[in-house]
């Protein structure tokens, strides 16, 4: 049975048993600062399990994308060396939220594996927590197993907890015996399904208290059960991985070194799904995890003797293997971006890889099996050459050389601490518990803003102070957050900023709504009491700022047209990476590896404005996620969607979107791109204006053009040619002025002082540019000479020092200039330049003179130096 069929059977089985199918949440967890990546099926239900979030759902089933390659949960180093570890994997799971418990959960599991999958009961065994007599007896009744097949485990392996406190409970694991005597024990008998019975709440003292609602959380690794169903002992022999490995073997022309091929297949799969969610290679956080995956795979590709980029060539096999699943659709939509990113990162890493491998070979030349590589050496590779530690460890493992982890950690020091602070967790702000409490108490806010701009009878359900404390009332001047039973105010989400407006009581008390946010469909009206007072339970007339809302509608619809147009002109690899829909502008970040040309920007502008002039109708409809995707709707990577989604259709553009939009594109008016720039590797940004803001922008540019035309004394149509002529004339004038400066410099009465065979030449130039003086200094080639010139122009003084080449082994220009201005300066032994205080020129020159005098070239011969003002004349240079 193939992997895709197992997934489909699992979902169908539990849907037929009254479970609601829930789509996989993104790999990037939402509102959870404790996790870098989603690493289990229960992550998206965590707040339901803890009671922080209410739900009408009683039962759920999902196939969850998981990644364990960073943060606390990291299987990266095990991948390739074991039969069952992966960085990316799918977790099949069924969940109960206060509905069924142990007996039903065990019945479901037993029925699925023995009837749906027809597994041989004789190859199965069960573990339970040693004090969980209930689970033990249920298993005996349902399976008919004797006591030797139901094993009591005393360790915490069979007691699961969400953290040091909170929901927890015993668990029961189902194991499968592959049966081959040639397998090691850990590979022969494998866990295929874990059933967690959440029935306790652990307090800070470690005491267990019964939960009011008992829950079920199960997890079965899809790859592991696929290995069982396909009668293979290694997860990498299942249909998905065998196809990827066959293709890498075909390209590399080598079938040996199974470890390398496993790593390539696993890391390609993980990298592809990360890129599909909008993660791109970088040096911090999740971006760095992606970079590590690609670079580690690249190292093994080169180890197999393939010296070209390979991952993007194998990627189509991954698409073919997963295309029947919804997750495969993600890869199809992001195909161009994934291939481009993989190829680019591989090629960029080639030089670093070869340099790093060569240096590591040097570091380990004199080391033999059992020796230890100093941590400082590994850190040098990592810090100076950008060579990943993972690859260093892989090479050492192959050579059976130990690694000095402590030495590496010590060398990393503060730098490592800073890096860890940046990538530990998702970086998102945690959501205050007060909002979850209010959601549980009042449920979702009813949003009526699609149909109405105001409601006259909104009831105040709760008032929260600026300290996030629930209060009964607020008076004039206080800043508060108000929860209404229904609202026309759009809560900030999907890139669109929140609405503003007012709440007015019957006694004419006025509350200004300064912003609106949203937490799990609870709308937070950020307010200030402008006049009067407000109390919990009051009824208010809630009105949005209609004119501001209309500008948001224009900009949001224009963003959809821009996205659609970019994909038409640049290609299907373009996907949204971020956006801002504000009243005065829109900003759109998208995947694209190169700067757009001016012609491309004009084409985009023209196409968007053409769609606006067509006055296309904008429509919305609610439909299932799968149906929306099948009809071509764009889902934004990283966003979490429910089973029912809102689709906004404007012409041929279809996007999943909860924002507000115009009814017809003609309302947008004019669309004008202001800037196009780079945000990060592979991500571009367009900022644009619509409506009156766009007209104002064009008008301002027209006014400025007319001012320029008046200044250069030419018609607007001839500004370019006139400026070209003026530029040429300016260059000629600059050349003439520079030549005049050179003559002035040459005409200066520059003196030199001899210090025991060394010519010390110093002079201060006034009102002559430093670049002219520098050029003059560079032309001086007299041997055994030290030059110290200062140039003062427009209250800025520059010191330039040059030492002739025959002296630089004994006297350094960089050292002299640092002594002169009493600070560390740049430059080199022959030439150095820095700014200095015009009032301390004499002190600087004196310091240089003293240093030359004190050098080993000098004797006890002393005389009055010529650089002092009023000094005796020395010989001319």
From Swiss-Prot:
Catalyzes the attachment of alanine to tRNA(Ala) in a two-step reaction: alanine is first activated by ATP to form Ala-AMP and then transferred to the acceptor end of tRNA(Ala). Also edits incorrectly charged Ser-tRNA(Ala) and Gly-tRNA(Ala) via its editing domain. Binds 1 zinc ion per subunit. The lineage of its organism: Bacteria, Pseudomonadati, Pseudomonadota, Alphaproteobacteria, Rickettsiales. The gene is alaS. It comes from the Bacteria. GO terms for cellular component: cytosol. Keywords: Aminoacyl-tRNA synthetase, ATP-binding, Cytoplasm, Ligase, Metal-binding, Nucleotide-binding, Protein biosynthesis, RNA-binding, tRNA-binding, Zinc. It is found in: Cytoplasm. Its cofactor is Zn(2+). This is Alanine--tRNA ligase.
